[in-house]
Amino acid sequence: MATASFNMQSVFAAPSGVLTTRNIRNTNQLFFKRIAPVGVRCMAQGDPIKEDPSVPSTSTSATPPQMPQSPPPPVSKPKVSTKFGDLLAFSGPAPERINGRLAMVGFVAAIAMELSKGENVFAQISDGGVGWFLGTTALLTLASMVPLFKGIRAEAKSKGFMTSDAELWNGRFAMLGLVALAFTEYVTGGTLV
């Protein structure tokens, strides 16, 4: 047993040779056997196993210093599409924002004209409002599409009080308000204000 233990410990102590036992004439004798050097390469991946500091280590060898790991490369944002079909798609960035901007201008203009002339929305449209509507629509659509074709999104430039989310919500309320104004004036037959 002592010979086997000594033999196993000598494997680590003498990397160029190994002590072996041979049975010669019914007696065990130790022999030094020369072996070719063997390279060992560790290919483990992941985090190394950490030892519990409360348990004393039985190993006499010091752990090699850890190589500093480089940080992972930054994740690049996907490029935004600037194709006309993608911008005006149902889930694209342009339709709701453009319609909201038009509704905000339309709601304020309709209320202002009601206060100044006393006409309802339908009378305003029939008195030359179609030309103003088409001109405003073309101007706001073009002004809204130019930054989108350059790849600039409203979300990237929104800070402080006037954010892109606030613009979307104001546009949604203006769309509802304009429809509610027209419906109320149609049902009552007169102006709201």
UniProtKB/Swiss-Prot annotation:
Biased-composition ranges, Low complexity, are: 54-64
Instruction: Name the GO cellular-component terms.
Output: chloroplast thylakoid membrane; photosystem I; photosystem II
Task: Provide this UniProt record's keywords sorted from A to Z.
Answer: Chloroplast, Membrane, Photosynthesis, Photosystem I, Photosystem II, Plastid, Thylakoid, Transit peptide, Transmembrane, Transmembrane helix
Q: Which Pfam families match?
A: Chloroa_b-bind
InterPro entries, per database record: Chloroa_b-bind
**Membrane topology listed for this record:** Multi-pass membrane protein
- What domain of life? Eukaryota
Biological processes annotated in GO? cellular response to blue light; cellular response to far red light; cellular response to heat; cellular response to high light intensity; cellular response to red light; cellular response to UV-A; photoprotection; photosynthesis
Q: Where in the cell is it found?
A: Plastid, Chloroplast thylakoid membrane
Compositionally biased tracts (Pro residues): 65-76
From the record, give the transmembrane residue ranges: 102-122, 129-149, 173-193
Q: Please give the residue ranges the record annotates as the region Disordered.
A: 46-80
Q: What is its main location?
A: plastid
Q: What upregulates this protein?
A: By high-intensity light, mostly at cold temperature (e.g. 4 degrees Celsius) (at protein level). This high-light-mediated accumulation is inhibited by okadaic acid. A stepwise accumulation is induced when 40 percents of PSII reaction centers become photodamaged. Induced by UV-A, red, far-red and blue lights illumination in a phytochrome A and phytochrome B-dependent manner. The COP9 signalosome is involved in dark-mediated repression. Accumulates upon heat shock but repressed at continuous high temperatures.
Q: Where is the transit peptide?
A: 1-43
Q: What does this protein do?
A: Probably involved in the integration of pigments into the mature light-harvesting pigment-protein complexes. Light-harvesting chlorophyll (LHC) a/b-binding protein required to ensure a high rate of chlorophyll accumulation during deetiolation in continuous high light. Involved in seed germination. May fulfill a photoprotective functions. Prevents excess accumulation of free chlorophyll by inhibiting the entire chlorophyll biosynthesis pathway (e.g. 5-aminolevulinate synthesis and Mg-protoporphyrin IX chelatase activity), and hence prevent photooxidative stress.
Protein name in the entry: Early light-induced protein 2, chloroplastic
User: Highest lineage ranks of the organism?
Assistant: Eukaryota, Viridiplantae, Streptophyta, Embryophyta, Tracheophyta
The encoding gene is ELIP2
